A protein has these predicted regions:
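Folded extracytoplasmic luminal domains of secretory or organellar precursors
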Residues: 21-167
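Terminal membrane/secretory targeting segments in land-plant proteins
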Residues: 1-24
Length: 167
């Protein structure tokens, strides 16, 4: 019984140190990015961040970019159904095309680049995704996507910063 309690205590201590190490890696990595709070929140909300390596954290950020691009595409489709203004429709369709490119080209390129250690390509792909969010925003006089475009831009910028940190 005494040895079981000792083993349990040791296990709990190791678990605590592991969590602290993961948080330290996240904090150290996120300090290298321009959006520290977004970086920390995104990584701490993903159980894969306990992997203990920076390239995996970059991959998690790329996945967050993909999720946001997909959410934006769904939101754009809903907005298209609800608008009759031809200028707004045209801009929304252009943004849909942009976010298809982010999801179907930039994200896979960055994912593969992080996986194979080609961090310059990961940085370029995520910088492209950030620029695409800005391009979408510029299509409108008053954008219905401002908050989402900014979030996508910031997530992609964090992912690009992590890739740059690895160079």
């Amino acid at each position: 019984m005494k040895s079981l309690m000792s083993l349990t205590t040791i296990f709990l201590l190791i678990s605590q140190f592991s969590v602290l190490a993961d948080d330290n890696l996240i904090e150290k990595t996120c300090k290298q990015t321009p959006f520290y709070d977004l970086c920390v929140a995104t990584l701490q909300n993903d159980s894969r961040s306990t992997s203990g390596n920076v390239p995996a954290l970059g991959g998690i950020m790329v996945d967050a970019v993909a999720v946001k691009a997909t959410e934006l595409l769904h939101h754009i489709q809903e907005l298209l159904k609800g608008t009759t203004d031809p200028k707004v429709k045209r801009s929304l369709k252009e943004c849909a095309s942009i976010y298809h490119a982010v999801r179907d080209a930039d994200v896979p390129q960055a994912t593969q680049a992080f996986a194979f250690g080609n961090y310059k390509f990961a940085e370029q792909a995520m910088n492209d995704a950030a620029n695409e969010a800005d391009t979408c925003q510029s299509k409108f006089v008053r954008s219905p996507l401002t908050v989402s475009n900014k979030n996508e831009h910031d997530l992609a910028t964090v992912a690009a910063s992590i890739a740059k940190f690895l160079l």
